[in-house]
């Protein structure tokens, strides 16, 4: 995966100036009517926050053609500095929408449960814990 160090610059490069002018772009952002892959933008923001917090960026991807149970992608793997019973890897999924699934995270946790610490989903909603997964608002990313 490749992330841009400046998310603002990424957004400005994502639009052709001839298609959307400055004021129109800002209005669309403010009214949540922007036709863009918001998942890419939010994932880039999270990557930028992880780097600013001193984390190295790792991810997991398996595109198995033979076994659907092995097909999964995890946006980030965060290494915790302390070992707790040999579990110091936290899988992190980033979700930009209000409705989403956790299929990849669930498969990953089941497959690698012995090596994992706490799984996280970073999203635009409130903080909660459900079935052992911590759901963090985006603004709390730097606390990982």
Describe every region a protein language model picked out.
Residues 87-99:
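Active-site ExK catalytic segment of metal-dependent nucleases
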Residues 58, 90, 118-121:
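A structural signal for isolated positions on well-ordered beta-strands in alpha/beta enzyme cores
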Residues 1-74, 78-84:
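Accessory nucleic acid-recognition modules appended to NTPase machines
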Residues 81-84, 97, 127:
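Short polar/acidic secondary-structure junctions
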Residues 12, 101-102, 128-133:
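Switch/connector loops and helix/strand junctions flanking conserved nucleotide-binding motifs
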Residues 84-85, 108-117:
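Arginine/glycine-rich "motif VI" loop of SF2 helicases in the C-terminal RecA-like domain
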Residues 122-144:
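Domain-level recognition of nuclease-like catalytic cores that cleave nucleotide substrates
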Residues 69, 97-107:
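Active-site-adjacent loop/helix micro-motif of nuclease/hydrolase catalytic cores
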């Amino acid at each position: 995966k490749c992330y841009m160090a400046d998310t603002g610059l990424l957004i400005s490069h994502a639009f052709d100036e001839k298609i959307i002018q400055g004021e129109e772009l800002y209005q669309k952002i403010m009214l949540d009517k922007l036709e863009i892959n918001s998942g890419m933008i939010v994932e880039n923001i999270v990557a930028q926050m992880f780097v600013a917090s001193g984390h190295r960026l790792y991810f997991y991807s398996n595109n198995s053609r033979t076994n659907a149970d092995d097909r999964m992608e995890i946006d980030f793997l965060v290494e915790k500095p302390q070992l707790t019973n040999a579990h110091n890897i936290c899988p992190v999924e980033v979700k930009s929408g209000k409705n989403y699934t956790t299929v990849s995270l669930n498969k990953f946790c089941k497959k690698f449960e012995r090596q994992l610490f706490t799984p996280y989903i970073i999203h635009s909603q409130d903080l909660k814990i459900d079935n052992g997964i911590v759901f963090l608002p985006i603004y709390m990313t730097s606390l990982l």
